[in-house]
Amino acid sequence: MLKRIKPDEIHLGMFIEAIDGNWKGQRFWRSRFLLASPEEADTLRASRVEWVVINTEKGTDVAFADVKARCLSAEAQLTRALKTVEQSKPLIKSIFEDARDGNSLPIDVAMQVVDDIEACMRDSSQALIQVTRLKARDEYTFLHSIAVAALMIHFGRSIKMTDATVKELALGGLLHDVGKVKIPPEILQKSGPLTDAEMITVRQHPQNSFEILSRHGNISEAVLDICLHHHERTDGKGYPDGLLGEEIRPQVRIASICDVYDALTSRRAYKKAWTSDDAVKFMLKQEGQFDRVLLRNFFYSMKF
């Protein structure tokens, strides 16, 4: 059976029947061959080829390759997830420091982090989500940003959102709490209950995030909306604007689910991490706070 796939879907063991696109000048002197060399696979993925036709009777299929990719050892997945997190933390920290100091934000760096998280989520999604659940007090905001971005990617893909929308979700998840740089660390890192005055200060962070990012002309409306309204609730009891139901765009409703889910399932100095099931069951009991259709779909997507 012949199947037309994108170059980034190819894997070793596939039989290449035809190459569609500008492949002249590449080192593929033939267009029908068994892909057995990692070097050829990398060259083909990096080429200007638009489509590749594979013959599943002579080589492996995409489905087989996907299974093989998912079957990476648990140790390999954990290693990759840890590496992604460790590489991302200083980059996110630098973005937040620029925001704190009033500097122009390096959005290209933020997109680099998004791309790294997206790549890791393709074959190590469970490991990455697990790794980000253990958060040191002074790193909570940075790891929470990675976790929410990862959850948004995972959920967006599971409900078949476009690649562009998923990337937008991820950027919103990564930057949604950047406004917390305006909040004193002693409030953010407080292990006990916040006073009323402290709570008012904390609740200013969505508006802070919006104002910081609004200074950049290349931030989409959806990302700005995620930053400003991720604490809104469908029953109208959220903040800062008390939006109700459909007044909250779907991307923001997804962000609110991922934001709360990560907070509940994260291990902190003052609380144990909740299980995924317990977190979603708790959220389902919060009548009217979350989009129930999206929340149930999110719950199903987390059944790794």
Predicted features and spans:
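Histidine- and acidic-residue-rich, metal-dependent catalytic cores
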Residues: Q87-F304
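Non-catalytic interface/linker regions that flank or bridge core catalytic/transmembrane domains
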Residues: M1-K135, E139-Y140
